[in-house]
Amino acid sequence: MIDRLMAREAIYQQSNPDPGGDPPEDGPPHGKNAADGGDEPDRGPDPDVTLRPQRMAEMVGQQDVIERLRIAIDAAQVRGEPLGHILFDGPPGLGKTTFATVIPSEMKTTVQMANGAGLKAPRDLLPYLTNVSRGSVLFIDEIHRVPRAIEEYLYTAMEDFRIDIVLGEGVNARTLNLSLEPFTLIGATTRAGMLTAPLRDRFQIREHLGWYTRKELAEIVLRNSKKLNIEVDPTSAGVIADRSRSTPRLANNRLLWVRDYAQSKTKGNVEASVCEAALDMIGIDHLGLDKQDRNYLDTLMRVFLGGPAGLDAIAHTMNVSSDTLEDEVEPFLLRSELLVRTRRGRLATPKAFEHMKRQMPDRPLS
């Protein structure tokens, strides 16, 4: 215990040059992020948490990933060892956090949850590491945002279950070796390419989460409608699934809005026409495009005659940042084959013109 307190104090002093500052309190971090500074007031259950599966048996989709994880979990339990470190990557909303919460349930252990953006210095990481128990899980979301200084502590923590703390400076410096209980680190990222190779290679299990099928999304909608105590028929579930961009999180968001709309407009009656009217009201069309998606395509077709046009030119015309378009708008348009990128710029496809009910220009689009 004394070594842990000395280590925490040493890391704090290295990270905080202000000698008058107070060291972090002993004990586990509160909430999901140590940077939060304390518990937030109770605002009632988070709908996303309420709808999230609690065990793997409740999960829909990603069955190949689930099967591989079941094998790894079973083998670890047979050996009586912690599960190997796991890295999940993929677009937002596909279940990375869900996996990070159900795996501890399957292993019958505890989980600490952190966010890479909140781990700004080694002193932010230390409370998590010193509070791991044997076989427990530490989940770091957005792990690609962890600074290099944090990574260096994770290397030995993941590989040797220890961290080395340098006490003092110069000729008086000495190293304190702090042993950790064997634990499982689960990382989640939407940008696996931003991870350094040394960190990426320390994950024994790496899984990429893919898009969900219409059938899988409809099943998710039907299951979660029961949790919300509303009746949704398969046809209505299909309408919601069609407009959810192959993403469970969006399907849940659409379902919550349809519930609110139905309770306000139709006394809770949910049918296909009600789902369509509810989603039309918030600008979600039958392909899942929202207002900004259609505004992008409209600008590309109306101003630039379908392209090719540069991203910056489109962004300036729409009065939207190019980062917003590149990160939030274009990925779905590209995946839906409504947009292509060429060396000369962005180009609307024939499918996009058909969807927007616009006539393609006579000149070849190249």
From Swiss-Prot:
Small ATPAse domain (RuvB-S) as annotated region, ranges: 213-283
Enzyme kind, highest EC tier: hydrolase
Main location class: cytoplasm
GO cellular component: cytoplasm; Holliday junction resolvase complex
Residues the record lists as binding Mg(2+): T97
EC number: 3.6.4.-
Keywords: ATP-binding, Cytoplasm, DNA damage, DNA recombination, DNA repair, DNA-binding, Hydrolase, Nucleotide-binding
Comment on protein domains: Has 3 domains, the large (RuvB-L) and small ATPase (RuvB-S) domains and the C-terminal head (RuvB-H) domain. The head domain binds DNA, while the ATPase domains jointly bind ATP, ADP or are empty depending on the state of the subunit in the translocation cycle. During a single DNA translocation step the structure of each domain remains the same, but their relative positions change.
Recorded superkingdom: Bacteria
InterPro entries in the record: AAA+_ATPase (IPR003593), AAA_lid_4 (IPR041445), DNA_helicase_Holl-junc_RuvB (IPR004605), P-loop_NTPase (IPR027417), RuvB-like_N (IPR008824), RuvB_C (IPR008823), WH-like_DNA-bd_sf (IPR036388), WH_DNA-bd_sf (IPR036390)
Matching PANTHER family: HOLLIDAY JUNCTION BRANCH MIGRATION COMPLEX SUBUNIT RUVB (PTHR42848:SF1), PTHR42848
Region (Head domain (RuvB-H)) residue spans: 286-366
One Gene Ontology biological process: DNA repair
Entries under CDD domains matching the protein: AAA (cd00009)
Family statement: Belongs to the RuvB family.
The reaction(s) this protein catalyses: ATP + H2O = ADP + phosphate + H(+)
UniProt source species: Rhodopirellula baltica (strain DSM 10527 / NCIMB 13988 / SH1)
Subcellular location: Cytoplasm
Region (Large ATPase domain (RuvB-L)): 21-212
Keyword field contains Nucleotide-binding: yes
Protein name: Holliday junction branch migration complex subunit RuvB
Single GO term (MF): ATP hydrolysis activity
Residues that hold DNA according to the record: R341, R343, R346
Subunit organization: Homohexamer. Forms an RuvA(8)-RuvB(12)-Holliday junction (HJ) complex. HJ DNA is sandwiched between 2 RuvA tetramers; dsDNA enters through RuvA and exits via RuvB. An RuvB hexamer assembles on each DNA strand where it exits the tetramer. Each RuvB hexamer is contacted by two RuvA subunits (via domain III) on 2 adjacent RuvB subunits; this complex drives branch migration. In the full resolvosome a probable DNA-RuvA(4)-RuvB(12)-RuvC(2) complex forms which resolves the HJ.
Gene name, Swiss-Prot/TrEMBL: ruvB
Described function: The RuvA-RuvB-RuvC complex processes Holliday junction (HJ) DNA during genetic recombination and DNA repair, while the RuvA-RuvB complex plays an important role in the rescue of blocked DNA replication forks via replication fork reversal (RFR). RuvA specifically binds to HJ cruciform DNA, conferring on it an open structure. The RuvB hexamer acts as an ATP-dependent pump, pulling dsDNA into and through the RuvAB complex. RuvB forms 2 homohexamers on either side of HJ DNA bound by 1 or 2 RuvA tetramers; 4 subunits per hexamer contact DNA at a time.
